[in-house]
Amino acid sequence: MIKLMTDNAANLPPDLRAQYGITELCLTYTIDGEPVDISKPFDGHAFYEAMRKGAEVKTSMITPLAAREAMEPVLDRGDDVLYVGLSGGVSGTCWGVSVVAQELRERYPDRDIRVLDSRGASLGEGLIVLEAADMAQKGTDMETIVARVNQLIGKMRQHFMVDDLKFLRKGGRLSGAAAFAGTLLQIKPILQGDPEGKIVVLSKERGRKKAMDTLIQLYEEMVEDKSAPVGISHAAAPAEALHLATALRQAGCTGEILSVCHEPVTGAHVGPGMLALYFYSQSWR
């Protein structure tokens, strides 16, 4: 049997994790220096409202101990492990889990332990994990699942708009001057995950409506198979997420649309008001 593992940056709701038997390892975070209890349900509205009011959020990677404690019981009962994790372009988490996996391979030479960098975050990671878990539940072998996951990683496209450029400035994505000017001019950048899993600016739009129209246009122009699943994540912007989902249906999307409040781990770096769209495509912008 193959056990699927991921991290909380994959943004998968608890019911889906339970349905597919997915184990979630957790990156942790603090708000104004106070550790947050990650065992409690995430209150996205309160989290992003605190950020809007100036709260300082800092995140930490999964510890080696946490990774080891999650994997050892699975290996002890004779199962294999496939971990699909947060992009190495924005976090060292996948690398850290890889180190633990190598240690465990030496202790469990008969077990198959794989660690794959999704080069994504939120549902750009989560949608891939769901398909891998579905394949594992159906008894698909490890090599076939890994090949499929790598194929999906190469096709996943992640585009998002942000409301306030200061969070990108803090993360070194924009200069302070550019962030200040952008705020004055109501410039809303459209960003994307590049082939290496790093965040880059795709375009800059005037106002949120134009930025959302651009997200919809990207879907219309790039997606070859409109029956494929799509992901939407929002940072305390549920009405806009619903509007985006409706617009996707009008644009011909017939696949499942999974919409979630964006998790805090990468949400800390994009800030409140972020709206993201995740889909599969053969092309890049």
Identify what each model region corresponds to.
Residues K3-A66:
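N-terminal glycine-rich anion-binding loop in soluble enzyme alpha/beta folds
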Residues G85, R114-V115:
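A glycine-rich beta-strand to alpha-helix segment
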